[in-house]
UniProtKB/Swiss-Prot annotation:
It comes from the Eukaryota. Residues 1-25, 185-275 are annotated as: Disordered. Residues 228-239 have a biased composition (Basic and acidic residues). This is Uncharacterized protein NCU11158.
Length: 275
């Protein structure tokens, strides 16, 4: 639709936009595959979010259907030609569905414009009686289109069905539930084996150490090397006495874990008492 006029591919003829002419042209497009009868979209035409949702949903449905076939029946009994035929049929139905949505939106837009013109002054549109008469003539076609459109929606929204002719033979049968059960059991067995291995390697020592720590809290021992000048203080008082060499003694002090850290003065007092 360009400037209120419709342009057809293959011809330079421009005709004024009219609802009934649009209806006849839509009927032609639905029954013919001629390239010269397809509409040329205007540069400002954009696909609606509703159409995009339909495209995404349908493509997800197609992907889910093929994945379900491959996962549920690993020895897939469908030939390549059959799979190509199914894919082509799905694509064709998707194209038809999108085309129906596009035509339906165009029809509703044309009806709304024509209704506004008729109600405003009955000068820009056809009389209501003539419009209703022409609609009555095309009623069967419209009914068939509605039925087909509903069928397409039902096809898209229903989950994928597998016919009996596509079921694998008894020799190629594959129990999906049994596979899931075996796989879950296999996972549990692997988990228990890993747990046993960890317990055998580290579990005994770790558990034994933790139990001993819970039962009793042993006192921590620290080895402190104290450099004691011996009688240095007394020699400092008496200048006449000679300085003596420092004597290195090793003292083992028991520090309780519950008590806080001892100050250096307390340690020196303990050392003096011991000496």
């Amino acid at each position: 639709m360009i400037g209120g006029e419709r342009v057809l591919l293959g011809s330079q003829k421009r005709e004024p936009s009219n609802e009934e002419d649009d209806q006849e042209q839509l009927d032609i497009d639905l029954t013919s595959d001629g390239k010269n009868q397809r509409y040329q979209p205007a540069p400002n035409d954009t696909i609606s979010r509703y159409h995009l949702n339909h495209i995404v949903y349908t493509l997800r449905w197609v992907i889910m259907a093929f994945k379900k076939l491959k996962t549920k029946y690993p020895p897939l009994c469908l030939s390549d030609s059959k799979m190509d035929q199914i894919a082509a049929d799905l694509i064709r139905r998707l194209h038809v569905l999108l085309r129906r949505e596009e035509l339906r939106s165009e029809m509703s837009r044309g009806r709304r414009v024509s209704r506004n013109l008729t109600e405003a002054g009955r000068n820009g549109g056809l009389p209501l009686g003539l419009r209703r008469a022409r609609r009555a003539q095309s009623a069967p076609d419209r009914t068939e289109r509605i039925k087909f459109y509903q069928e397409m929606l039902r096809f898209v929204r229903e989950p994928p069905m597998i016919s009996t002719s596509l079921q694998p033979s008894p020799a190629e049968s594959w129990d999906h539930d049994r596979f899931l059960k075996d796989w879950s059991q296999r996972g549990e067995e692997e988990e228990t084996d890993d747990t046993k291995e960890l317990c055998e390697t580290y579990g005994g020592e770790v558990n034994q150490d933790s139990r001993e720590e819970d039962q009793q809290a042993p006192a921590e021992t620290e080895v402190i090397e104290v450099c004691k000048p011996g009688d240095g203080e007394e020699n400092a008082k008496d200048d006449s006495e000679q300085e003596q060499a420092p004597v290195v003694t090793t003292e083992v002090i028991e520090v309780q874990s519950s008590s806080g850290s001892n100050s250096p003065d307390d340690g020196n007092e303990q050392l003096r008492h011991h000496m």
